[in-house]
Amino acid sequence: MGKTLYQKLFDAHVVYEAEGETPILYINRHLIHEVTSPQAFDGLRVAGRQVRQVNKTFGTMDHSISTQVRDVNLLEGQAKIQVLELDKNCKATGIELFDMNTKQQGIVHVMGPEQGLTLPGMTIVCGDSHTATHGAFGALAFGIGTSEVEHVLATQTLKQARAKNMKVEVRGKVNPGITAKDIVLAIIGKTTMAGGTGHVVEFCGEAIRDLSMEGRMTVCNMAIEFGAKAGLIAPDETTFEYLKDRPHAPKGKDWDDAIEYWKTLKSDDDAQFDTVVVLEAKDIAPQVTWGTNPGQVIAIDQLVPNPAEMSDPVTKTSAEKALAYIGLQANTDLKDVPVDQVFIGSCTNSRIEDLRAAAAVMKGRKKADNVKRVLVVPGSGLVKEQAEKEGLDKIFIAAGAEWRNPGCSMCLGMNDDRLGEWERCASTSNRNFEGRQGRNGRTHLVSPAMAAAAAVFGKFVDIRTIKLN
């Protein structure tokens, strides 16, 4: 019987598998940041252990840093401690660190791919739940906890049980104005936030193949949001073109040999999947979440669902609780709902393609009066540099947005960028949980174009009706 891409990747990295025990996997790439690594390094010191393979671990600063200042001395509290600790630990062990003073610094899941650290066929781990992003390259990538970070630093291996296999096929082509974010939100809406639990999911179909690498990263980034362990897309010419000449990508004959191997990284025709989900691309409309998990999502031309019409008691109770928190009534048209803030950024949507899409909407327009703040936060120093070369920063600033430095920013309430209590935000991030963007903040997940439209019109609008300047 044939193998799935996941099975091929997993089996290729098994170091040891005793009968009846969890397999031990070799880890090709370990990415670290300032939040989940300090305790791991402390554990190494206490145990008297060294970092086993320094050249396979890379660090960056992203979660708790300020997007306004680049000087560690101007940081405060926990953020300053975490940044200084990461710098100290990387210097002590020889780990390469992309710190705040380099243009290579960025959100870990933006920095890794653009540096060529993310390659097809690899196993990649990071102390961050959205490590699945790297699966867009045909790599087996997943988030790990701090104790596992320590284990990988010490051994370059990790115990990992086999997951089930899931295939999500998006057939045909999407309509104009529909983005990768809309595709993945539609998938989560269909599967629910737990639909992929216990699985590694492979995304396929014409609509997935049509996506750029930036779009594929957006899709895999949110695999975790429907419960999957990891997300995968088989590598192809789009992948190879993106990676060619990246700093850490193979060169010369090594590149040719790598391409030959990478072309084998696909599911066999007779591979068996435990779960199969199919969507028709033509049916996908611009998506907006209405509740407090990414599975509570509708198309912009639909009304907020009525919990009274839900037959499952758990789903009904969850919807009632979500609507109470989010401050909406059943059967509300989201196009009538004003927003207080807009956030364009995060490891989901802060790449150059995302910023171009937002700028196309905001060009020649101004922030709506009712919108208190619009944050545009590039995913890395290189994205920022490219955006400024193209003049995108000037478009954002002219529209009344704030153009910031790279970082995780308002995706999570761990730094200075937060919502005020009960403020409503159109956000390009990946989670709309209660309090995710700040105490009692209300988050609606959308694509960059939809977020930009909310910024200039002051409410949610159907991007398909907006003329681009």
From Swiss-Prot:
<dbReference type="InterPro" id="IPR036008">
    <property type="entry name" value="Aconitase_4Fe-4S_dom"/>
</dbReference>
<keyword id="KW-0100">Branched-chain amino acid biosynthesis</keyword>
<dbReference type="Pfam" id="PF00330">
    <property type="entry name" value="Aconitase"/>
</dbReference>
<keyword id="KW-0408">Iron</keyword>
<feature type="binding site">
    <location>
        <position position="411"/>
    </location>
    <ligand>
        <name>[4Fe-4S] cluster</name>
    </ligand>
</feature>
<feature type="binding site">
    <location>
        <position position="347"/>
    </location>
    <ligand>
        <name>[4Fe-4S] cluster</name>
    </ligand>
</feature>
<comment type="subunit">
    <text>Heterodimer of LeuC and LeuD.</text>
</comment>
<keyword id="KW-0456">Lyase</keyword>
<dbReference type="GO" id="GO:0003861">
    <property type="term" value="F:3-isopropylmalate dehydratase activity"/>
</dbReference>
<feature type="binding site">
    <location>
        <position position="408"/>
    </location>
    <ligand>
        <name>[4Fe-4S] cluster</name>
    </ligand>
</feature>
<comment type="function">
    <text>Catalyzes the isomerization between 2-isopropylmalate and 3-isopropylmalate, via the formation of 2-isopropylmaleate.</text>
</comment>
<dbReference type="InterPro" id="IPR015931">
    <property type="entry name" value="Acnase/IPM_dHydase_lsu_aba_1/3"/>
</dbReference>
<keyword id="KW-0028">Amino-acid biosynthesis</keyword>
<comment type="pathway">
    <text>Amino-acid biosynthesis; L-leucine biosynthesis; L-leucine from 3-methyl-2-oxobutanoate: step 2/4.</text>
</comment>
<dbReference type="GO" id="GO:0051539">
    <property type="term" value="F:4 iron, 4 sulfur cluster binding"/>
</dbReference>
<keyword id="KW-0432">Leucine biosynthesis</keyword>
<dbReference type="GO" id="GO:0046872">
    <property type="term" value="F:metal ion binding"/>
</dbReference>
<keyword id="KW-0411">Iron-sulfur</keyword>
<keyword id="KW-0479">Metal-binding</keyword>
<dbReference type="InterPro" id="IPR018136">
    <property type="entry name" value="Aconitase_4Fe-4S_BS"/>
</dbReference>
<dbReference type="InterPro" id="IPR001030">
    <property type="entry name" value="Acoase/IPM_deHydtase_lsu_aba"/>
</dbReference>
<dbReference type="InterPro" id="IPR050067">
    <property type="entry name" value="IPM_dehydratase_rel_enz"/>
</dbReference>
<dbReference type="InterPro" id="IPR033941">
    <property type="entry name" value="IPMI_cat"/>
</dbReference>
<protein>
    <recommendedName>
        <fullName>3-isopropylmalate dehydratase large subunit</fullName>
        <ecNumber>4.2.1.33</ecNumber>
    </recommendedName>
</protein>
<dbReference type="GO" id="GO:0009098">
    <property type="term" value="P:L-leucine biosynthetic process"/>
</dbReference>
<dbReference type="InterPro" id="IPR004430">
    <property type="entry name" value="3-IsopropMal_deHydase_lsu"/>
</dbReference>
<keyword id="KW-0004">4Fe-4S</keyword>
<comment type="similarity">
    <text>Belongs to the aconitase/IPM isomerase family. LeuC type 1 subfamily.</text>
</comment>
